[in-house]
UniProtKB/Swiss-Prot annotation:
Its EC number is 2.5.1.75. Belongs to the IPP transferase family. This is tRNA dimethylallyltransferase. InterPro entries: Dimethylallyltransferase, IPT, P-loop_NTPase. The gene is miaA. It is an enzyme of class 2 (transferase).
Length: 301
């Protein structure tokens, strides 16, 4: 069972309800909720919620790790095997489309980039700026350079790392994929699609609740580690803005506004991404989800 959807759409509550009713195990498919340092700011299930049904792959990775889609698929393969041996229903839930695509379509065969290449590219990114790297990428991989926004630091650096390390453009590697761990015909895949305005209001209220629940202290502890700002955990929604506040650059109110706005923009992109990249997911209104699950999984939802 795959449950996807934009952030704050009610995925976790639905997955927990299904796990309790079916004897299932909830398996995380969110790229930020894997980090143990970020329970509050990523809206990970609470300890009380985790006690109601088995949960896997939540808070298992240190924030200093650049946890890739390949690493996720490897971890998910182990979790799925263990859940199946236990005779439980695997319920994969999250909002990271790339993870779902890797699970159901297979993973591209991009080899690991040597640390010295990655470090050299990041050093030049900080020293020379993203425009210089974008121009260099155009010389090595013009297709990627044309496709990527000139200010997209992360993706430009990644594309340049791959072509420098392997001598082949990233698109070439993406054409080679491994067999999918979860073929589309073997799963029920749902995308929760709430009303946009209601979702955005919920995002705003949830971000405020996160701050009241200790998100600022959580981010302060992360900031004290002085990790590479390009690491995924350091770019989780709300983290950069709250770090700016902790440095005295902006007020807490400004940080909250930026964090909530970034999250709303991300939710909008999730709608678009799933519609175009994973059209096999069944779009369901949250209020209709129970009825849909009872139809496709009678007696288990």
């Amino acid at each position: 069972m795959l449950i996807a959807g934009p952030t704050a759409s009610g995925k976790s509550a639905l997955a927990l309800k299904l796990a309790q009713a079916s004897g299932g195990t909830v398996i995380n498919t969110d790229s930020m909720q894997v980090y143990r340092d970020l329970r509050i700011i990523t809206a990970r299930p609470t300890p009380d919620e985790e006690a109601l049904a088995p949960h896997r792959l939540y808070g298992t990775v240190d924030a200093a790790v650049n946890f890739s889609a390949g690493a996720y698929v490897e971890a998910a393969a182990v979790a799925l095997a263990e859940v199946r041996v236990a005779g439980r229903l695997p319920i994969l839930i999250g909002g990271t489309g790339l993870y779902f695509k890797a699970l159901t379509r297979g993973l591209s065969a991009v080899p690991p980039v040597p640390a010295e290449v990655r470090d050299a590219v990041r050093l030049r990114l900080d020293r020379d700026g993203v425009q210089a790297l974008h121009a260099e990428l155009a010389g090595h991989d013009p297709e990627a350079a044309a496709r990527l926004a000139p200010a997209d630091r992360t993706r430009i650096a990644r594309a340049l790392e791959v072509v420098l390390a392997t001598g082949r453009p990233l698109a070439d590697w993406h054409q080679q994929t491994s067999p999918p761990l979860l073929p589309p015909d073997d799963v029920v895949a749902v995308f929760l699609a709430p009303d946009r305005e209601a979702l955005y209001a919920r995002i705003d209220s949830r971000f405020a609740a996160m701050l009241q629940g200790g998100a600022l202290n959580e981010v302060a502890a992360l900031a004290e580690r002085q990790l590479d700002p390009l690491l995924p955990a350091m770019k989780a929604h709300g983290v950069p803005a709250l770090i700016r506040h902790l440095r005295g650059e902006i007020t807490l109110e400004e940080a909250a506004s930026i964090g909530a706005a970034d999250t709303r923009h991300y939710a909008k992109r999730q709608f678009t991404w799933f519609r175009h990249q994973l059209p096999e997911f069944k779009w369901v209104r949250p209020q209709e989800a129970d009825a849909f699950l009872n139809t496709v999984m009678p007696g288990r939802a």
